Amino acid sequence: MSAVRPHPVVHLELHTGDREGASAFYADLLRWRTERIDAGCASYHALALGGAFGGGIVQCPARRPVWLPYVEVDRVDEVTERASRLGASVLLEPREGPTGWRSVVATPEGGEIAFWQPKARHRGWGAAA
């Protein structure tokens, strides 16, 4: 039997209607440092977790704040297609960014999860191995 490599959570994003308040709360509570980054259409507060950036806080019209985990995969297109076959709804089709490819799906139970395929020069921080 061959071993299957587990897919680690490598990035966390908080989607909230109060980015500034959330940034202050987590800075005070957990000493998470935030850095504002211009992401084109909106600013993004990157989170320094354990000395490296591994998350972010995004301003969005949310009924309630939601944490979105990004799971590293080998082939984002294949995993997104497999999730769809298993009953997930694709919220964001696989797309390329500066450091990799990502997609987002809603699970059959209504949760959301993002898939991340890094480019060779970029590796996630590995929050959970």
Roles of regions detected by a PLM:
Residues M1-S23, W67-P69, P118-A129:
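N-terminal beta-strand motif that seeds the catalytic metal site of vicinal oxygen chelate
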Residues H11, R19, R36-G40, A48-L49, ...:
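Residue-level hotspots at or immediately adjacent to binding/recognition sites across diverse folds
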Residues R31-I37, S89-P94:
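Short secondary-structure junctions
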Residues A48-A62, P69-E72, E81-S84, L91-L92, ...:
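Conserved, structured core segments of small domains
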Residues R19, Y70-E112:
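Vicinal oxygen chelate
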Residues Y26:
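Catalytic core of tubulin tyrosine ligase-like
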Residues W32-V66, V105, E112-P118:
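Conserved short beta-strand elements that form part of the metal-binding/catalytic scaffold
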